[in-house]
């Protein structure tokens, strides 16, 4: 059995951290064994922020719906349309009873936490509480200032959010 090293050198399975009871953040799924873990955890929807790999074909056999929302981890301002797609997908998913959303990128450090922040902000969470909750639950998160600013610029134009 191939073992994957998690952060800090610890051996780990799927890199997934629940930041709320229905929203998880983590690293890449990459192969079927990890997709099986994701589906077994009750995840019904995946927002894949990594440009490196599209999870759609891996997810199909397990009935998991995927939004491939790829973006480079380039520390540049992210367009509102990117955040809008993810927020729309997540909120529609969360409207379904029993659904759970996994938001991931390659390592779960920058892009996925940015998208999770956008989702929580769109749900009405205050910025400080959303940042703190994500960072406390997933200690490898590194909120790049430019990504937080991208989310806040998006939220300014998002109807009814962040209030």
Task: Name each model feature, range by range.
Residues 1-101, 107, 115-163:
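Cys-dependent protein tyrosine phosphatase-like superfamily
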């Amino acid at each position: 059995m191939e073992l994957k090293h998690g952060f800090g050198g610890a051996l780990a399975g799927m890199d997934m951290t629940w930041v709320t009871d229905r929203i998880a953040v983590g690293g890449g799924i990459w192969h079927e064994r990890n997709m099986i873990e994701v589906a077994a955890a009750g995840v019904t929807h995946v927002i894949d922020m990594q440009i490196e790999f599209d999870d759609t074909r891996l997810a199909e056999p397990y009935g998991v719906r995927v939004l491939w929302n790829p973006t480079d981890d380039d520390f540049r301002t992210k367009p509102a349309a990117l955040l809008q797609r993810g927020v729309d997908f997540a909120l529609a998913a969360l409207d379904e009873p029993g659904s759970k959303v996994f938001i991931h990128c390659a390592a779960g450090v920058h892009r996925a936490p940015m998208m999770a922040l956008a989702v929580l902000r769109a749900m009405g969470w205050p910025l400080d509480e959303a940042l703190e909750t994500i960072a406390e639950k997933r200690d490898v998160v590194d909120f790049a200032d430019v990504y937080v600013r991208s989310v806040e610029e998006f939220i300014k134009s998002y109807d009814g959010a962040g209030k």
